[in-house]
Design a protein with these regions (language model features):
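Residues within the helices of the helix-turn-helix
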Residues: 9, 21-22, 51
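DNA major-groove recognition helix of helix-turn-helix/homeodomain DNA-binding modules
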Residues: 48-63
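Short, charged recognition helix plus adjacent turn
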Residues: 2, 14, 65-71
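Short, conserved catalytic or interaction motifs in soluble domains
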Residues: 40
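A short, Lys/Arg-rich alpha-helix, primarily the initiator
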Residues: 1-17
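Short alpha-helical DNA-recognition segment
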Residues: 17-37
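The alpha-helix within a helix-turn-helix
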Residues: 12, 25, 54
């Protein structure tokens, strides 16, 4: 999940306007501390959470998980 954490952080930091982890979590429909915990590797996202994050950033789940380099 190390690759997931790094990609998630990179996506969040590049998205305009820049949003903090709590706001990003809320916009994805996740608990307020979810993005922080995922970026730090403290938690593993559920399939439902992966779908919400992928939809928010308009990327594939395969990209988030490091299975492909194409967004």
């Amino acid at each position: 999940m190390e690759q997931f954490s790094a990609r998630l952080q990179r996506l969040r930091e590049r998205k305009k306007p820049l949003r903090n982890r709590k706001v990003t979590s809320e916009l994805c429909g996740l608990p307020p501390d979810a993005i922080r915990r995922y970026e730090r590797g403290e938690a593993i996202p559920t399939a439902d959470s992966l779908i919400k994050i992928a939809d928010y950033y308009k990327v594939s789940i395969d990209y988030l998980l490091g299975r492909t380099n194409g967004i």
